């Protein structure tokens, strides 16, 4: 028996790694390394390595540096970080600080208008909520139909939306709900 134990201790070929052990560092360690690299300003240096640069690209979104992302957001909103209004497509300030003369009641009334969403964003929100409701067992369909009334856009967009919801309901085995949706789709067309 001692020969066998000595052979295992000496011969590395017989020693196997556990399946969960790997050569790459853990997720937390990679996060700490990425944070350190960002603080030092050496994000894509040779020391950081290719794995770090790939992670950084994934974290910031499609390899867009955070500084460019901030400027794109500023272009979208029309305001810079210091409160100066800007022309879309340029970074030149137009006027002074933007102030508001609305009272609290006016802000409540204009809450929806202050942050307008596009039709696609509204429809995407509705779709997420409807899919969540479909996946829950024992739900009543009235709430889902109320949400579906809020779908915006031309009939072609609404038709595609209903078809995707029908597919999701069929995937979740909601036959009654699929029948109701098909009836609503026929009425809409």
Swiss-Prot record:
Q: Which UniProt keywords apply?
A: Nucleus
Q: Which domain of life is it from?
A: Eukaryota
GO cellular component: a single term: nucleus
Q: Where are the transmembrane segments?
A: none
Q: Does this entry carry the keyword Membrane? A: no
One Pfam match, by short name? INT_SG_DDX_CT_C
Q: Where in the cell is it found?
A: Nucleus
InterPro entries (alphabetical): INT_SG_DDX_CT_C, Integrator_subunit6
Molecular-function GO terms, alphabetical:
identical protein binding
For this chain, the family text in UniProt reads:
Belongs to the CT45 family.
The molecule here is called: Cancer/testis antigen family 45 member A10
Which species expresses this protein natively?
Answer: Homo sapiens (Human)
